[in-house]
């Protein structure tokens, strides 16, 4: 069997890590899978991997010693395909191709060179453009990411394959009594904006907000909303599947590819309220609304969904099978194993 490696900067719960875990489980019967990351965490404890390698230097923008450690792992384990799923990991995965031969796949989960670049955005985009020359496949998870790759970064179209993210079927929401429970699931770091949603709901006592996720902003957010009885922080939850216990899923963020938590909520058949960024629009088909990242628009759209809730829930039920992973399995395997 082939030996396939996944390299991701961090191993804590997040969209890229969830993606690595789901894809690994999908292909595990057809190849040996290895994980390379910078730290122990949620992902390294999964039993799907034949080997797990921790290289702390992957967190750094560039380090020669890290590059040679990666080369050694690839050669000693005869890894023929390496899939990078985060920005820093993507830099090392492409540069190590100068030292060893393998099939290199880079997965964009929102193009951090655009949303994290700041004043250096143009430089990071140039770097990403030239790194693409060392990449066999640029895997875009949404049409929005594909468009940005071509128009904003300048990546050549033949390098790009666009296949949507997808997730296992979540437990579906049945006809339960409406409780006006709103759910946010995401890592509490940039570019997520849970504070906008919390500010809105703190002023609307008819709703309750339940925030699932850890991250560097968790404690400061808990302190900020400590006196709000309808704002609840559940912290980091391993293997969260309980979307069906809530009435609405909302993800407010400054940037997304095609968010894994949004996909999970979609398959659970609950209405969605999502920021109009990245590929989020691909999840909305009458089953929810897109918002600008302002409190006024979030509040207005939140009320609009609950005022016509049965219609949005009916559309959510109809759409819930679209992003189930079994529908995309052959396409994923073709990219990785083909």
Curated annotation (Swiss-Prot):
| Pfam families in the record | Glyco_transf_4 (PF13439), Glycos_transf_1 (PF00534)
| Swiss-Prot/TrEMBL keywords | Glycosyltransferase, Lipopolysaccharide biosynthesis, Transferase
- Which SUPFAM superfamilies did the record assign? UDP-Glycosyltransferase/glycogen phosphorylase
Q: Main EC class of this protein? A: transferase
* Catalytic activity of the protein: N-acetyl-alpha-D-galactosaminyl-di-trans,octa-cis-undecaprenyl diphosphate + UDP-N-acetyl-alpha-D-galactosamine = alpha-D-GalNAc-(1->3)-alpha-D-GalNAc-di-trans,octa-cis-undecaprenyl diphosphate + UDP + H(+)
GO function term, MF aspect, one: glycosyltransferase activity
Q: What is its EC number?
A: 2.4.1.306
What positions belong to coiled-coil segments?
A: none
Cite the InterPro entries for this sequence: Glyco_trans_1, Glyco_trans_4-like_N
Q: Which GO terms describe its biological process?
A: O antigen biosynthetic process
Quote the pathway field. Bacterial outer membrane biogenesis; LPS O-antigen biosynthesis
Record bears the keyword Transferase? yes
Q: Which family does it belong to?
A: Belongs to the glycosyltransferase group 1 family. Glycosyltransferase 4 subfamily.
What is noted besides the main data? O86:H2 and O86:B7 subtypes share the same O unit, but the O units are polymerized from different terminal sugars in different glycosidic linkages.
Its biological purpose: Involved in the assembly of the O-repeating unit during O-antigen biosynthesis.
Q: What is this protein called?
A: O-antigen biosynthesis glycosyltransferase WbnH
The protein's organism comes out as Escherichia coli
User: What's the gene?
Assistant: wbnH
């Amino acid at each position: 069997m082939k030996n396939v490696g996944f390299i991701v900067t961090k191993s804590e719960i997040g969209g890229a890590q969830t993606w690595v875990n789901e894809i690994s489980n999908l292909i595990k019967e057809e190849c040996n899978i290895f994980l390379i990351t910078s730290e122990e965490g949620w992902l390294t404890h999964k039993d799907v991997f034949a080997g797990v390698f921790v290289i702390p230097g992957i967190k750094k923008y560039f380090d020669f010693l890290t590059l040679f450690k990666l080369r050694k792992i690839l050669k000693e384990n005869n890894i023929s395909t390496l899939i990078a799923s985060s920005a820093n990991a993507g830099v090392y995965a492409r540069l190590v191709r100068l030292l060893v031969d393998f099939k290199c796949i880079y997965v964009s989960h929102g193009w951090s060179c655009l949303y994290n670049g700041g004043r250096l955005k143009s430089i990071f985009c140039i770097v990403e453009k030239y790194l693409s020359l060392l990449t066999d496949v640029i895997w875009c998870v949404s049409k929005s990411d594909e468009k940005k790759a071509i128009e904003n970064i300048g990546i050549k179209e033949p390098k790009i394959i666009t296949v949507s993210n997808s997730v296992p079927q979540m437990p579906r929401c049945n006809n339960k009594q409406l409780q006006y429970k709103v759910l946010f699931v995401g890592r509490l770091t940039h570019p997520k904006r849970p504070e906008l949603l919390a500010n809105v709901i703190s002023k609307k006592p008819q709703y309750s907000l339940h925030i699932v996720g850890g991250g560097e902003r968790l404690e400061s957010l808990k302190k900020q909303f400590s006196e709000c009885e309808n704002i609840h922080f559940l912290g980091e939850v391993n293997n969260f599947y309980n979307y069906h216990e809530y009435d609405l899923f909302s993800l407010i963020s400054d940037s997304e590819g095609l968010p894994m938590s949004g996909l999970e909520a979609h398959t659970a058949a609950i209405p969605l309220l999502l920021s109009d960024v990245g590929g989020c629009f691909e999840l909305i088909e009458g089953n929810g609304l897109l918002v600008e990242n302002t409190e006024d628009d979030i509040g207005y759209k939140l009320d609009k969904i609950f005022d016509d809730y049965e219609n949005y829930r009916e559309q959510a039920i109809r759409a819930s099978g679209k992003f189930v992973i079994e529908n995309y399995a052959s396409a994923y395997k073709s990219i990785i194993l083909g």
